[in-house]
């Protein structure tokens, strides 16, 4: 296994000028012709035998090879014969040469695979009936297709002690075939060197050397890439077989990236969550919170409507009674006496329905929990609050300036993209804010926001780096905008971005200014005209307050008049429900077909995987029923009609998996000059500094026992490091 600096040096060597490289390609096409089982195929120079075979649809068996990891070539399962070559070659590691005829199904190739498979199975235990990998195991499939029908191994099989690497990944290391996929993933994708090998030959083992937790926010992905049952999910252990589950394609709402997922369910219960391929967002990875927090969907759920009685206690009631009480209050108060706050997990359909309902009572006090400055361009220009370069676009950047953010825990898949570009494209990264572990090296410019002024004026040394960059990115974390000087920070970043565009070699299509959001609902709420932050409610306390999934604790009972009537609509009894006078149980993201917009402005849909528990209903349906009882019926009855209304208000919300370019950067910069606010000297400190802060950030993950175990394991691990044993 090559260390990262060595690998980066080798990558640099591979980028030699073409004049210094001897090639067999023709000058006209730069492609070379090879043959796969007699079938001609044209490929790029440097293409491996395995890639050439896949190009014509020929599948080569493999265990260690993975297209997103470096080539190890140590399982030897991909051995194929090259015509006139003395020996078989490893298809994953051997570059093709002009005129080669690759024989994938020759007797020599088959014999080689059978021999490799026999060696792999010699020490492999017969655990298939009790192995969680059963039914989706590469070793099972390939031994059936390419292996022999009997073994000649008569000696005793070896046994390996299992490793404890945390509460998420279960290890049965006797099943390990030493493909090193997990080691390469940890080192290359996750940026953590916790995993490695010890011993050699028959005594070789994969582990952490000393017993410790695999400290990564992406650790669950080693379960997916493990070709055997050596690494499986601890929470999922012995619960279901893959052929028993129903799979629903959906998206994740634990952060603002919008990772694509597959929800596996059985008998109306979420059994597990797996990643779904999307090259422009999450590739084929997901974060541990996305993967393992699903048990929070079953705990602390609101399943029936509740009202507060004369004694001040919340008691169960019927939908008719609960909606009638709320309708009565909406009929009694109008205008500024009615307000609403939308939480971080709310879908666009519910947001537009609530907006229409409050507009019927002449109120426009619709707020989000997350603050975004309204001074200057504010939220009037969409480019002002999006990740304009896009998530995949970071792979084209040559310089990234991070401001007040820790993307490793606020947006793990975006951070993985930055690491990927840093590793393969020599990306230069700089950070303004508290020093954090980002899994890649960066220049720490300091933690004071006043550094932004120095960069904007050109007096800071990093100004020259940005000026010389061809595709620079400035990424401002939304957490930095929660400060009292958020408007000044946004104006300073906007000024830097515009000056870079004017003075460097940035082309017209490249976008410099980027906002990295943390919560799933924020972009859709801003698109629909919600006011960011609850300052308007604090200044003018309402008589009726509607909390739509608002569990961030941005407002408390003490902030409101004693006679304020609070309605909470959501799916968990978390922060908002205990202060409410009426509770309306809603549906979680796995229980409804809903629209969410990620930080880059891409609209995506969740799908119904299970039905809501008890009497809970979809949020927009509750609001629609409430409007009818209150005598102000909203003009839609079906989901399609709600989405037609979404299209009227903001057409981009129904253009799924599409990103609309936003280019009003110059106008935003001109308006930012009108901001009359000074930068504070307080350091920029992101709320999620360590992995302990990553696991429990919303109502679902806070209800998850698995996430609580992670916090406990990380805390105990940190204490063990701080307080070493006397022995």
Swiss-Prot record:
GO cellular component, one term: mitochondrial matrix
SMART domains, sorted: NADH-G_4Fe-4S_3
Cofactor(s) needed for function: [2Fe-2S] cluster; [4Fe-4S] cluster
2Fe-2S ferredoxin-type domain location: 30-108
Domain 4Fe-4S His(Cys)3-ligated-type: start-end pairs: 108-147
Domain 4Fe-4S Mo/W bis-MGD-type: 245-301
Topology in membrane: Peripheral membrane protein
Binding locations of [4Fe-4S] cluster 1: 124, 128, 131, 137
Record Gene3D superfamilies: 3.10.20.740, 3.30.200.210, 3.30.70.20, 3.40.50.740
Keyword GTP-binding part of the UniProt annotation: no
InterPro entries tied to this protein: 2Fe-2S_ferredoxin-like_sf, 2Fe-2S_ferredoxin-type, Mopterin_OxRdtase, Mopterin_OxRdtase_4Fe-4S_dom, NADH_UbQ_OxRdtase_75kDa_su_CS, NADH_UbQ_OxRdtase_ferredoxin, NADH_UbQ_OxRdtase_Gsu, NADH_UbQ_OxRdtase_Gsu_4Fe4S-bd
Illness: Mitochondrial complex I deficiency, nuclear type 5: A form of mitochondrial complex I deficiency, the most common biochemical signature of mitochondrial disorders, a group of highly heterogeneous conditions characterized by defective oxidative phosphorylation, which collectively affects 1 in 5-10000 live births. Clinical disorders have variable severity, ranging from lethal neonatal disease to adult-onset neurodegenerative disorders.
Reported function: Core subunit of the mitochondrial membrane respiratory chain NADH dehydrogenase (Complex I) which catalyzes electron transfer from NADH through the respiratory chain, using ubiquinone as an electron acceptor. Essential for catalysing the entry and efficient transfer of electrons within complex I. Plays a key role in the assembly and stability of complex I and participates in the association of complex I with ubiquinol-cytochrome reductase complex (Complex III) to form supercomplexes.
Protein name: NADH-ubiquinone oxidoreductase 75 kDa subunit, mitochondrial
Taxon lineage: Eukaryota, Metazoa, Chordata, Craniata, Vertebrata
Gene from which this protein is expressed: NDUFS1
């Amino acid at each position: 296994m090559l260390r990262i600096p060595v690998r980066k040096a080798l990558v640099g060597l591979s980028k030699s000028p073409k004049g210094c490289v001897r090639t067999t390609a023709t000058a006209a096409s730069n492609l070379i012709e090879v043959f796969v089982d007699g079938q001609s195929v044209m490929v790029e120079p440097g293409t491996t035998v395995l890639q050439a075979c896949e190009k014509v649809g020929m599948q080569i068996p493999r265990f260690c090879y993975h297209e997103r990891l470096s080539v190890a070539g140590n399982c030897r399962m991909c051995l194929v014969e090259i015509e006139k070559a003395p020996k078989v070659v490893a298809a994953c590691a051997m570059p093709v040469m002009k005129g080669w005829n690759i024989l994938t199904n020759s007797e020599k190739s088959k014999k080689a695979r059978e021999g490799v498979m026999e060696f792999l199975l010699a020490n492999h235990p017969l655990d298939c009936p009790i192995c969680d990998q059963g039914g989706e195991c590469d070793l099972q499939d390939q031994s059936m297709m390419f292996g022999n029908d009997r073994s000649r191994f008569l000696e005793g099989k070896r046994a390996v002690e299992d490793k404890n690497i945390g509460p998420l990944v279960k290890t049965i290391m006797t099943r390990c075939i030493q493909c090193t996929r997990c080691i390469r993933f940890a080192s290359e994708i996750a940026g953590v060197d916790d995993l490695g090998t010890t011993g050699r030959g028959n005594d070789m083992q994969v582990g952490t050397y000393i017993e410790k937790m695999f400290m990564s926010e992406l650790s669950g992905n080693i379960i997916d890439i493990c070709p055997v049952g050596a690494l499986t999910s601890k929470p999922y252990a012995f619960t279901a077989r893959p052929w028993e589950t129903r799979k629903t394609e959906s998206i994740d709402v634990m952060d603002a990236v919008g990772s694509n997922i597959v929800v596996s369910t059985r008998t109306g219960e979420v059994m597990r969550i797996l990643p779904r391929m999307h090259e422009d967002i999450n590739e084929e990875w997901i974060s541990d919170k996305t993967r393992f927090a699903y048990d929070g969907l079953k705990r602390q759920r609101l399943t029936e409507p509740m009202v507060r009685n004369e004694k001040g206690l919340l008691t169960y009631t019927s939908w008719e009674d609960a909606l009638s009480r709320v309708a009565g209050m909406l009929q009694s108060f109008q205008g500024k006496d009615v307000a609403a706050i939308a939480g971080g997990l709310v879908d666009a359909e519910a947001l537009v329905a609530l907006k229409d309902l409050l507009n019927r009572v002449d109120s426009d006090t619709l707020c989000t929990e997350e603050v975004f400055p309204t001074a200057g361009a504010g939220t009037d220009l969409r480019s002002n609050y999006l990740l304009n370069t896009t998530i995949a676009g970071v792979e084209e950047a040559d310089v990234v300036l991070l401001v007040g953010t820790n993307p490793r825990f606020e947006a793990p898949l975006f951070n993985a993209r930055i690491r990927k570009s840093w590793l393969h494209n020599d990306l230069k990264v700089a950070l303004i804010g508290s020093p954090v572990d980002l899994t890649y090296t960066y220049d720490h410019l300091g933690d004071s926001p006043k550094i932004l002024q120095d960069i904007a004026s050109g007096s800071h040394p990093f100004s020259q780096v940005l000026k010389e960059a061809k595709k620079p990115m400035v990424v401002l974390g939304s957490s930095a905008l929660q400060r009292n000087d958020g408007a000044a920070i946004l104006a300073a970043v906007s000024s830097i971005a515009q000056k870079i565009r004017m003075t460097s070699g940035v082309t017209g299509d490249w976008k410099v200014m980027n906002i990295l959001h943390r919560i799933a609902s924020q972009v859709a709420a801003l698109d629909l005209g919600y006011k960011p932050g609850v300052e308007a409610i604090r200044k003018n306390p309402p008589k009726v307050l509607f909390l739509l999934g608002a569990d961030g604790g941005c407002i408390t009972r003490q902030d409101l008049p004693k006679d304020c009537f609070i309605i909470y609509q959501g799916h968990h009894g978390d922060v908002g429900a205990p202060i409410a006078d009426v509770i309306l149980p809603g549906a979680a993201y796995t229980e409804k077909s809903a629209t969410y917009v990620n930080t880059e402005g891409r609209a995506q849909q969740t799908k119904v995987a299970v039905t809501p528990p008890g009497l809970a209903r979809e949020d927009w349906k509750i609001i629609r029923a409430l409007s009818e009882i209150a005598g102000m019926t909203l003009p839609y009855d079906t989901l399609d009609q709600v989405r037609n209304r979404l299209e009227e208000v903001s057409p981009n919300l129904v253009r799924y998996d599409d990103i609309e370019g936003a280019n009003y950067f110059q106008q935003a910069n001109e308006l930012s000059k009108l901001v009359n606010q000074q930068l504070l000297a307080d350091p920029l400190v992101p709320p999620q500094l360590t992995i302990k802060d990553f696991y429990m950030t919303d109502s679902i993950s806070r209800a998850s026992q698995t996430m609580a175990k992670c916090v406990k394991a990380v805390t105990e691990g940190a204490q063990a490091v701080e307080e070493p044993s006397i022995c």
